[in-house]
Regions:
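ABC-family P-loop ATPase nucleotide-binding domains
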Residues: 3, 53, 58-149
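ABC ATPase nucleotide-binding domain signature region
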Residues: 16-79
Length: 203
């Protein structure tokens, strides 16, 4: 059978301290690329080298355990990343506003509640680079506003690699651009160059 490569022989260097926006059409492989960079999904060939502390894709719940409570999940993640479990737990409990559900297993959570916990876990860690799949909304406008504010605070001392099909979102957060198309990733020297090339694809 002929194999279909989502990412075909992709090779790229992401500069430290630079926020990179990766544009691509729906289904181009943007989310797959982020999962590979973050370590949530291994590449079929080659390797990913990181010399800074990189987050998992924000709002990606793959590292959360359905049988554990919200509190237990946050303490587990804190230990894995060398953070203070008590401080991590306190931040997540206050930030998510899950109430009694914070002490209930994740299998009882709605999708929005799981997203809240995943957001909080991401914000509780001081990463050098955050991986962002769009600026994910939770369906709760008030919480989404709080999340964006917390995210902007983190970006004062960190960079991001963001994937999106929305050029306005990329322009809001990023300074350098790239395009993923046909399984290939092309880096550009400036964001304007990337946006111009992306506009050609979408025309």
């Amino acid at each position: 059978l002929e194999s279909n490569h989502v990412l075909d022989d992709v090779s790229a260097t992401f500069p430290t301290g630079v926020s990179v926006g990766i544009l691509g059409l729906n289904g181009a492989g943007k989310s797959t690329l982020l999962r590979v960079i973050g370590g949530a999904e291994p590449p079929d060939r080659g390797s990913v080298y990181k010399d800074v502390r990189v987050s998992w894709p924000i709002a990606f719940g793959g590292g959360l355990h359905a049988s554990l409570t919200g509190r237990e999940n946050t303490r587990f993640i804190a230990r894995v990343y060398g953070e203070s479990p008590a401080k991590f737990e306190r931040f997540a409990e206050e930030f998510t506003e899950l109430g009694r559900y914070f002490d209930m297993p994740l299998r009882t959570y709605s999708t929005g509640m799981r997203s809240r916990l995943a957001f909080a876990a991401s914000m509780a860690c001081n990463f050098d680079c955050y991986l962002v799949d769009e600026v994910t909304a939770t369906g709760d406008k008030r919480f989404s506003s709080r999340y964006r504010q917390a995210f902007k605070e983190r970006l004062k001392a960190a960079s991001i690699i963001m994937v999106s099909h929305n050029s306005q979102t990329i322009r809001q957060f990023c300074t350098v651009g790239a395009i993923i198309h046909g399984g290939k990733l092309k880096m550009f020297g400036t964001l304007d160059q990337a946006l111009a090339a992306y506009n050609q694809i979408t025309m």
